[in-house]
Amino acid sequence: MASFWSGTVADFLRTPMSEITGSLAMAQIRHFRVSAAQQLHAWEVTISMLRPALAAIPQAETWHILLEYPMLRLGKRPDVILLTHSAILVLEIKARSSMHTAADRRQVEDYAIDLYDFHAGSRAHPIIPILVAENAVDAVPDMPLILNMGVMSPLDTSANALPALLIEVTRHTDTVAGKLDADAWLRAPYRPVPTIIDAACMLYAKHNVAEIRAARSDSYNLNLTTTAILQEIAWARTAGQRIILFVTGIPGAGKTLCGLNTIFGVEDAGRGTYLTGNPTLIHVLREALTRDAVDLGAQRSDARRKMLSVIQALPKFRDHYVSHPAEAPPESVVVVDEAQRCWSANWAIGKTRDKAVPLTRSEPAYLLEIMARRSGFCAMVCLVGSGQEIHAGEGGLAEWGNALRDAALHGIEWHVRAAPDLLKVADLRQRLGALDNLQSLPPLHLNVAIRHIRSTLAAFGVDRVLEGDASGASELARGMGELPFWLTRDLMATRKWLRGHARGLRRAGLLASSGAARLRSEGLGAELPHMDASSVAHWFLDRFPDDVRASDALEVVATEFSCQGLELDYVGLCWDADFIREPGRREWRVRTFRGTKWQVPQQAEVIANQVNTYRVLLTRARYDTVVFVPNGDEDDGTRNPVIYNDIVAFLRACGARDLDDSYLDRCPESNEGLGGILAQSVLELPT
């Protein structure tokens, strides 16, 4: 993606300021559809500050300078990127400021890490984030050890001290680093992988939708699926027909992104809403979208009210229209998140018998009937997660098939498009069955994981682990180079590792199964209340140390109910004795804690849900997962050390690596060893 203004430093020094700011303003309007008036002063300060600083360095004339380089984080761009002869300098300039805040340091460091992770031309050179507070005390900071590649810790400076700092940085980098070809850097691909939250904000504001779709070369599958959905919806709209599409995918393949793009990202998609029964996803997306709208000038109360219709709780949507049978929804396009989790008829009847709105049919039957109240065109896009069922009473795709057949018997016709695997899957709960007007569309299956930054195969490694296939997981690990999983028996080591790696705005957090009852003995009894909107928003969106309620405080543990559908950059997975290995048995043993002892459930649904719980937990990380397994206690029958040791032995056999002391010594935020740490997070980007 091109910066708002780019040229050599010589060009920068001789181009009139008005011409540069005019180019910046036009780019601001073109990219973000908002006026740049409030930015003009900041740009003028930046230009006025940089010109004398760069003019004082004779060799700087042949450097390259980029102003306002979009980083696929809505409205957030580093002010300046300087390409010297040997290094990449990322400058964030705070006009009129006299303070270097922790938040500002995280911001500029995050920009630098984004370049390292996602820009192919930035991997072989030092990247140095510099925070310039215009009116700060004039001092050149002590120069840390600068390596020949990797992201250095942020340097603080002022406007007056900037020239001296640039000279000192250049002296060091020219000594240790190779030559940087600015033209090659400008041609190199920048392929970021936005988080779900970033993508939602961008799609809702209709910014950079094309860049999101093309973010990775391995997102071809995602692009095919998105295109297929939009083409089928366009056909149904033109024909005035009802259509329902079933989109399947492995964990982290982009189902949520497809759904959000259907609702937010297309000009002619019609009025739509995203329905989910996942309260955490509702809380986090609504709050993130609200905060973003406020940052762009909206009133918070207005933004919050608007988000109520954009992201809706499926149970409230359902109950409203069940209790108002003559009312049709205004939305012509509805995305149903995790459609396989909709309630079966028996479960719906039992769960709502004493509620204000008692149900007599399955949730799929109600949703189809509600949308069919609209005359003419309507579309439903059902997102189906493979191995994501973690609740009792989830009816699977068979309930949707039954509801569609029943609708046809009552004269309500739906055109059905489904991924091929839903027609032949072995699990009868997840098979649609025979339907009129059914077409199999291969693009509706997402089989390439894009959540994980380093490998598209991480989800398949998790599958082998949960199948009890240590040799298969180990073979896959060798093919990947290594699995993105680490092992430790030390909770403090887990926290140290997470804090050392979650630099910039990368987010870390502790996860555990809701059945991990004996982790309390390790001090992990504080569990994130997933139904509490405020607690969930603080955990996923705020930052430690500014807010101790944030995930990266590493104090409160999120369960599968809190994190399903969302993600973290780095995960500390706390593994308890609710999911264990037994000698001579390939399958995992599922246990539940009752009273004072562990019990072994026999119900197939309970067992399957617990396997899926660990699938959810093992696939939340965008980078790496550290698995903490307690040592246990010989004097406590509920924490048998042998059981925990067997878990560790199996995970080690699968390819998980031990978090040894030598590696932990490199975790603090000094530059010592950062090159080695960051080298392990290399994303092989195509050239």
Q: Where are the regions a protein language model picked out?
A:
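Accessory nucleic-acid engagement/destabilization modules that flank
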Residues: M1-P192
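Hydrophobic anchor at the beta1->P-loop junction of P-loop NTPases
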Residues: V247
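Conserved helicase/translocase motor-coupling segment
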Residues: G259, H391-E394, L422-E567, V571-A577
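Conserved RecA-like ASCE ATPase "motif II neighborhood" in helicase/translocase motors
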Residues: D302-M371, E555-T559
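Signature of the SF2 helicase/ATPase Hel1-core->accessory helical subdomain module
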Residues: V336-R431
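C-terminal accessory regions
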Residues: A379, A553-L664
